[in-house]
Amino acid sequence: MITANSFERTIGGRKLVIESGKLARLADAAITIRYADTELLVTLCSAKKPREGVDFLPLTIDYEERMYAAGKIPGGFIRREGRPSEQAILAGRLTDRPLRPLLPKEWRNDLQIIITVIASDKENDADIWGVVGASTVLAMSEIPYEGPVGASRIGYINGEFVLNPTFAQLESSQLDLVVVSTRKAVVMIEAGSKEIPEDIMINAIEFAHKANQELIDLQDEIRAKLGKEKLPVPVLEIPEEVKTAVAAFVKGRVNEALSHQDKTARENAVEGLQAELVAALSETFAEGDILAAYDKEIKKAIRSTILEKDIRVNGRGIKQLRQLDAETGLLPRVHGSALFTRGDTQVMAITTLGSLQESQQLDGLSAEDTKRFMLHYNFAPFSTGEVKRSGSPGRREIGHGALAERALVPILPTPEEFPYTIRLVADVVGSSGSTSMGSVCSSSLSLMDAGVPVKKAVAGISIGLITGENGTYCTITDIEGIEDNYGDMDFKVAGTRDGITAIQVDMKVKGISFDIIRDAIYQAKEARYNILDVMDKALAQPKTELSPYAPRMYKINIDPSKIGSVIGSGGKTIRSIIEQTNTTVDIENDGTVVIGAIDEASAKKAIKIIEDLTKDIEAGSIYTGKVTRIMTFGAFVEILPGKEGMVHISELADHRVEKVEDIVKVGDDITVKVIEIDNQGRVNLSHRVILNPNAVPISRNRDSQPRRPGPFRPSDRSNS
């Protein structure tokens, strides 16, 4: 038996075990991390040589879900795992975002961390343990790394913070917060919440940071025992003579180029100055060094202007929003639409409503199997005026869509209140920073325009950070793309007037203090209110009527014991209803039936069929049915879908009838009255009493009547 190094802690009342040396022994570093009965294999491999021609850290983090982990066989024709699920992509991003700032920017060797979920107890989310596992293998490896980090999930239930809540606990929690931090500072925050007040959110982040310390202690213990000696950090210095020459050439001109309020004009000015610079110095110095030095001059100009003068590149104040505009009812025929504009950033959001049958089917390790609300974010290359490949969404698009979706979930009506599947598409048509928060604003308005009875409007804002020497810093409201590129933080906050619904924080520095967190959260609140004022002018309340092109949903309730009558054998009956009426029919186990139709007449037709299928036949009731069979002694009539009774030959007319065929034929419609239901459930009908209301029906001894093929009991043929 292979022996492994094992390390244990009790975290949140459950056992955490990290083992190394048993699996993936040829990887540069590998561990298994197990929390309760959820287990992951985390590996790290590094290329031996730097990759040529790259000017960034080539880090790849893949998060892979094995369906066997939850005892499931993958769906699809080939029955094996294919492209990662949306949840797996988001979990990979959750790991990448906090670790990247802690690795040397100068590192050029390919790094690949693969996180594989190999066991899932369906109670504990594996995503945060992917972060802890990835941090552990980096700490053990020879890669320079300024970690380790801890990662904790925090819930807020009945006024108490809960460390690493289970899936079941999260359903009743007002908060789903993930915080990743080092020993001293927070490096990543991600949250979805039900309008949590700012002070509670800050306290929750502090609670998580304290909980992370035990995970950092554990990794330090592992590193002390198993860690390799770290490699030196590569040095990529720009020669001093290049920096001096570039600074002298652009002196005073960089600030002038950056001062244009219009993004296109600013970019043209910056690129024009760059072209002059390269033309003047390229015979003396390497072009790569010139461009790197010029980039540093731009960064220095942007940051120093903010720190020293409280003025930004385009002349805005540090808390000043860009020009805002909101518009609804943008497109014809669609169910709901809105356009939100913030400076040069524009997002068009379109709402489409469908039946609950159109919910997304999830095939992953998630506890959920369907999803009725979807927000899909698209970022076209024309939004930045560039020529790029246009194709399926990447990790960034999926992440931005998930953030906007999370921000809107708390204000949506329940399926009981609004039995629709809701799909939002946020198309970025212009980008100069903060498109994800623009997507929140436009999507909130689009839902209202579609008539979705949302509880409140939601707005989003991004707060940036510029740090200086000796701990000085400045938080800036509504960052543009250039401020995001050269700044230290992107602190996104979405919410209503009553609280926060989502947070996502990414940074380029190695962590932020709680003073910065506090400033950013309250600065975002002030900006959010201003944005909501503009949105309210466009549309303050959801429309009271749905679009005429949206499907209509009608809800009825039936006896749960009659569900089988509606579904039928192998779904035959319900398929027939859908085909006959051109509707959709969803049935819940409690007997709730939701009918979706493009018009009221189709819905009423479907409702009538369902009510007839579940209705009990009562003596004395009158029905118009169809003759299904002719016997010598009478005719069988279907009076409700799948339910028959018999009209004896003597009850077909108010005179003597020699042959049944003289009065009716198969397929004829006939109005009859139920005159008797015997103790075996067989139904006797009369047409004679319809013709002559004063006629007295003849009571018969049904035991003397022949057995089927002619019994008169009500039947649900679809169940036979």
From Swiss-Prot:
Catalytic activities: RNA(n+1) + phosphate = RNA(n) + a ribonucleoside 5'-diphosphate
Xref: Pfam families: KH_1 (PF00013), PNPase (PF03726), RNase_PH (PF01138), RNase_PH_C (PF03725), S1 (PF00575)
Named cofactor requirement(s): Mg(2+)
GO molecular function, one term: polyribonucleotide nucleotidyltransferase activity
InterPro entries xrefs: ExoRNase_PH_dom1 (IPR001247), ExoRNase_PH_dom2 (IPR015847), ExoRNase_PH_dom2_sf (IPR036345), KH_dom (IPR004087), KH_dom_type_1 (IPR004088), KH_dom_type_1_sf (IPR036612), NA-bd_OB-fold (IPR012340), PNPase (IPR012162)
Chief localization: cytoplasm
PANTHER family: POLYRIBONUCLEOTIDE NUCLEOTIDYLTRANSFERASE, POLYRIBONUCLEOTIDE NUCLEOTIDYLTRANSFERASE 1, MITOCHONDRIAL
Name of this protein: Polyribonucleotide nucleotidyltransferase
Species of provenance: Dehalococcoides mccartyi (strain ATCC BAA-2100 / JCM 16839 / KCTC 5957 / BAV1)
